[in-house]
C-alpha cells in the first residue's frame, strides 16, 4: 500500500501481530457481560456457542471472570478457579480456535 507522512496505510482487515498473537484482522471484540454461566460459575454451552459465532473477529476479549472464589460479583458470572470452570473455558477456547479465532481473558 502507498505510504504517507505517517507511514504505510493499514486497514481494519489487515492482519496484525502482537507479541506471540497473530490476528487475522484488527477487529477487537470488547468484553461484554453475558451472565450465562451456571450457578457454580461454569461456562455453559450457550457461552461456548456465543464465542464460537464471533470467532471471525481479529481478537475476542472474554467477559469478566472471577479469578478467586471471593471475586464473584453477580449471578451468572463465570469463574476460572475450579477444574470444572477451567474445563468450561477450555471448551470455549477450543471452539473459537476451531473457527480460526483468537480469544484472551
Predicted regions located by residue number:
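Flavin-dependent oxidoreductase catalytic cores
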Residues: 1-104
Amino acid at each position: 500500500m502507498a505510504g504517507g507522512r505517517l507511514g504505510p496505510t493499514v486497514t481494519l482487515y489487515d492482519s496484525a501481530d502482537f507479541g506471540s498473537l497473530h490476528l487475522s484482522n484488527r477487529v477487537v471484540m470488547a468484553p461484554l457481560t453475558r451472565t450465562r454461566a451456571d450457578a457454580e460459575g461454569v461456562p455453559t454451552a450457550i457461552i461456548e456457542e456465543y464465542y464460537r459465532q464471533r470467532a471471525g473477529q481479529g481478537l475476542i476479549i472474554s467477559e469478566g471472570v472471577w479469578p478467586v472464589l471471593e471475586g464473584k460479583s453477580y449471578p451468572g458470572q463465570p469463574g476460572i478457579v475450579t477444574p470444572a470452570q477451567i474445563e468450561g473455558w477450555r471448551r470455549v477456547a477450543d471452539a473459537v480456535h476451531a473457527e480460526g479465532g483468537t480469544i484472551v481473558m
